């Protein structure tokens, strides 16, 4: 993570701030892909998390991901947040589809 602009932003409640991974621009065979054929990037790295949302009994439910986790995002959704000319996306914890495990 080159910049630290996301440190100026703290998500509230069950929100998660992510930085999308870069799209593949070259195939394994060395062929350059045009932008239209690259597809939408659904992988991201978590850069900040909120404190959690309220459960049914009023207790705070912690967010299910932590900073540094690699996650799978839905194709649509999220709120674009621009910090120091860099694009980040804000999702609810429940909207994140999964977490990659090493």
Swiss-Prot record:
Record flagged with keyword Mitochondrion: yes
GO biological process, one term: chaperone cofactor-dependent protein refolding
GO cellular-component term (any): mitochondrial matrix
Residue list for modification N6-acetyllysine: 8, 40, 56, 66, 70, 80, 86, 99
Positions of post-translational N6-succinyllysine modification: 28, 40, 54, 56, 66, 70, 80, 86
PROSITE patterns named among the record's database cross-references: CHAPERONINS_CPN10
Main location: mitochondrion
SMART domains tied to this protein: Cpn10 (SM00883)
Modified sites of kind N6-malonyllysine: 40, 54, 56
Induction: By stress.
SUPFAM superfamilies: GroES-like
Keyword terms, alphabetized: Acetylation, Chaperone, Mitochondrion, Phosphoprotein, Stress response
Chain positions with N-acetylalanine modification: 2
Entry similarity comment: Belongs to the GroES chaperonin family.
HAMAP family in alphabetical order: CH10
Protein name: 10 kDa heat shock protein, mitochondrial
Protein species of origin: Rattus norvegicus (Rat)
């Amino acid at each position: 993570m080159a910049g630290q602009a996301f440190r100026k932003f703290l998500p509230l409640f069950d929100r998660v701030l992510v930085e999308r991974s870069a799209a593949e621009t070259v195939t394994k065979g060395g062929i350059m892909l045009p932008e239209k054929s690259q597809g939408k990037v659904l992988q991201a790295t978590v850069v900040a998390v909120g404190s959690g949302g309220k459960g049914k009994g009023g207790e705070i439910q912690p967010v299910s991901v932590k900073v540094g986790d690699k996650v799978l995002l839905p194709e649509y959704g999220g709120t674009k947040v621009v910090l120091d000319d860099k694009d980040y996306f804000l999702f609810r914890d429940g909207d994140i589809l999964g977490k990659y495990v090493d």
